[in-house]
Structure formats: structure tokens, C-alpha cells
């Protein structure tokens, strides 16, 4: 892993839970930031309990989103003074509480920037800071539903199907990280912080950018097409003798090459399939022809033949196949991060390389409260003060 640490020296106070906020701050930590994760003393981030799967008792969901951070176990209701002091020495403050909660408790952006004008303050919400849904709670599947994604996923005529990864959560985290980094860059010129707002709902709108533009331009409402792509055919998954293959014949030349490999005599010259608009209009008939031909091939043989003909195609692989694939290994995307409780821990690095070096995580995810004492000492608390706070249950000190 490379030593690309452009955010080295940046202190982040992270008051987020679940996935979107933690993924944002994991990215910042991998880029060099000192991320201080604030967690409730009793159980910590709720994601610590999400599972199975668990790895030696640790939630793999939590392990995958919190590498490189330090953990401070702090009761926000009783430890406001502690939180404010930590924010006084920070560059970034990020929270994912319901709208108005931070302000009502005294650690909204205005209150914190009165004391630290350089502070970049980021909020991750469900449906945005304005509008009739601003108070609604939300998780990734709710955003997928309300944001229109579920209207596009699933088989034609069937119910919506949740996308099998938390792409709205992680996408929102990436947008938050982008906004924070942009605000930090501007701060170098202005000396002042900014307030960043992102939400799951807004991320779904960005993900649906070309579908929304298409609707606004045509008045046509896109629907479900299974694994197919509405505007191109053939462009979908087909079943082989022993698996599934995604075929992407995105133009006339590729369609002709596919037809040649599958020995679809007369199909290229069939008036129903001459151009892509023709093929889209007669998608069902074309899919039946191709499906019957593909079913006679093994996955390996078909992929080899399509590759030789220059037709884009890929096997449908499961997570185990992807995690152990030589391509994944060659890219260095799976990283070992020895953890006190999970010595063989491996997780996924950032999908970015700088000068040929993978941007990876610098430390394993923290145990709850592992860094409370160290961080409080850095903020100016002495041993007696820390002991008093721990005795009152305001903080939890590990060990």
C-alpha cells in the first residue's frame, strides 16, 4: 500500500453511525486524516451489533466501514463540554443525527464555528435539510424505494428488488467526503470553514441522473427490465449450461459478432434486428433466440469465444469468486489489517491508486473506547479529570 496522505494533520470528529457517515470518514482516514469516532459508551455504533456474519464476535459490517479510526466512548447528552472541546481543536466535524438535533443540543454548525471559524461542518441526513420530507428518518432501502431505484430493479411486471449492496449509503459517504475535501481546499484561501449537507435521497437523484433527464425530455417513465438495459439490446444476463454470462453487444458491429459466435443464421439481416432501436423494440423475441443458443454453451467456452470475437462479456460471479479472483489480487484491493480480536482480518482498500500504489487503510477498526484516554489527554484533560468523567459514566476508558 502506498503512503499517499494528503489529509495528514487534518483532525475529524465523527459523530455518525451505521454506514454512510462511517464510510465517508473511513475514506478520509485512508487519505491521512486523524478520525476520532465518537460512540455511545454502552454499545458503541449500532453497526457493531449488525450481523451475522460476525468474525470472532465482531460485526463484519462494522469492520468494513471503520478502518483507520480512533474510538472515543462519550455520552453526548452528558458530555457536551467534552464534545465541544474536541471540536475546538478539529478541522472537520461530521454528524448524522436527525435534522435539528445537533442544534438543539448545542453543537450545531453555528455554535461550533463561533469558537472555531475554520471548522468544516458536515451533516449526513436521510431526505435533505429542506422540503416536506426533511424530518423523515431513513436508511438505504428506504432511499432506494422513495428515490425511484426500486421502480427500476427487478423483472418486468414483478415487484421492485432492493439492490444487493448499500450503494446509496456508500455513495452518500463519498459525496460527503468530496464536499469536505473541497471545503478544506477552499479554507486554505479563506481561512473559514463551510457547512456541508448531503443526504441519501439526494444521492439517489444523482444516481438516477440519466433516467430523470430521459423522463423530463420524453415524458416516458422508465420501468423494470431485470438485468437488461432499457436503451440497448442485447445487453443482459443469459444462462449457460453451468452458470450465467452478462453480454453487452452495444452496437451493430458487436451484435453481428455475437450472432456469428452463436451461429444465429439470418438474425443480423432480420428486419426486426437491423439497428439498435429495432432490437430494443423487439427485445423479447431477440432475447429468446439468444437465450436458446447460449444455453448450449458452458460459461468458460462462451466467454472464450466471445473474447476472441471482441464481444464484451463477463461471468456472473459470487462474492467468494470475486474476493479470491486473480484480478482482485493483482490490484491489491483486499488488504490484511490485523485486529486485536480478528488477527486474520482482511477488508477492502480504496478503489484508487496514486502513482501506481494502492490507497489502503492505515490501521484496523478500533475497539470501543480504545482511544478515549489518549484523545482526552490531547484535548487538555488530565488524569484526574478523565477519571472523574469515567466515574460519572460520561466517558468509557478501555482497559
Tell what function each PLM region has:
Residues 1-11, 223, 239, 321-399:
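Terminal low-complexity tails and localization/encapsulation signals of metabolic enzymes
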Residues 42, 127-128, 200-205, 242-244, ...:
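Glycine-rich beta-alpha junction loops
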Residues 173-193, 206-218, 259-265:
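Oxidoreductase and adenylate-handling cofactor-binding alpha/beta cores
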Residues 129, 157-165, 188-204, 223-230, ...:
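Conserved Rossmann-fold dehydrogenase catalytic segment
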Residues 307-328:
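Conserved PLP cofactor-binding pocket of PLP-dependent enzymes
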Amino acid at each position: 500500500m502506498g503512503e499517499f496522505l494528503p489529509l495528514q494533520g487534518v483532525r475529524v470528529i465523527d459523530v455518525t453511525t451505521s454506514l454512510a457517515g462511517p464510510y465517508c470518514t473511513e475514506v478520509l482516514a485512508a487519505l491521512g486524516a486523524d478520525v476520532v469516532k465518537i460512540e455511545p459508551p454502552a454499545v458503541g455504533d449500532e453497526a457493531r451489533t449488525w450481523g451475522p456474519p460476525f468474525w470472532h464476535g465482531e460485526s463484519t459490517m462494522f469492520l468494513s466501514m471503520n478502518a483507520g479510526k480512533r474510538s472515543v466512548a462519550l455520552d453526548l447528552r452528558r458530555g457536551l463540554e467534552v464534545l465541544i472541546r474536541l471540536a475546538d481543536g478539529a478541522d472537520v466535524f461530521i454528524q448524522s443525527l436527525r435534522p435539528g438535533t445537533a442544534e438543539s443540543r448545542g453543537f450545531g454548525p453555528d455554535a461550533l464555528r463561533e469558537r472555531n471559524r475554520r471548522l468544516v461542518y458536515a451533516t449526513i441526513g436521510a431526505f435533505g435539510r429542506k422540503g416536506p420530507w426533511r424530518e423523515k428518518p431513513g436508511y438505504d432501502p428506504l432511499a432506494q424505494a422513495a428515490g425511484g431505484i426500486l421502480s427500476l430493479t427487478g423483472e418486468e411486471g414483478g415487484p421492485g428488488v432492493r439492490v444487493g449492496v448499500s450503494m446509496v449509503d456508500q455513495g452518500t459517504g463519498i459525496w460527503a467526503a468530496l464536499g469536505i475535501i473541497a471545503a478544506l481546499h477552499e479554507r486554505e484561501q479563506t481561512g473559514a470553514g463551510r457547512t456541508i449537507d448531503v443526504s441519501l435521497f439526494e444521492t439517489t437523484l444523482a444516481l438516477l441522473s440519466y433516467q430523470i433527464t430521459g423522463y423530463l425530455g420524453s415524458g416516458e417513465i422508465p420501468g423494470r427490465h431485470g438485468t437488461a438495459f432499457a436503451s440497448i439490446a442485447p445487453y443482459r444476463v443469459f444462462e449457460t449450461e453451468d452458470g450465467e454470462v452478462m453480454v453487452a453487444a452495444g452496437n451493430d458491429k458487436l451484435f453481428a459478432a455475437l450472432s456469428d459466435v452463436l451461429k444465429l443464421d439470418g438474425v443480423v439481416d432480420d428486419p426486426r434486428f437491423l439497428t439498435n432501436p429495432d432490437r430494443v423494440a423487439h427485445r423479447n423475441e431477440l432475447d429468446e433466440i439468444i437465450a436458446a443458443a447460449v444455453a448450449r454453451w458452458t460459461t468458460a467456452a462462451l466467454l472464450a469465444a466471445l473474447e476472441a470475437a471482441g464481444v464484451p462479456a463477463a461471468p456472473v460471479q459470487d462474492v467468494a469468486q470475486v474476493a479470491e479472483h486473480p484480478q482482485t489480487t493483482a490490484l491489491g484491493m483486499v488488504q490484511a489489517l490485523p485486529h486485536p480480536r480478528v488477527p486474520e482480518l482482511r477488508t477492502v482498500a480504496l478503489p484508487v491508486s496514486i502513482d501506481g500504489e494502492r490507497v489502503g487503510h492505515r490501521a484496523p477498526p478500533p475497539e470501543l473506547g480504545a482511544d478515549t484516554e489518549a484523545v482526552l489527554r490531547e484535548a487538555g484533560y488530565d488524569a484526574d479529570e478523565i477519571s472523574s468523567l469515567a466515574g460519572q459514566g460520561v466517558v468509557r476508558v478501555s482497559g
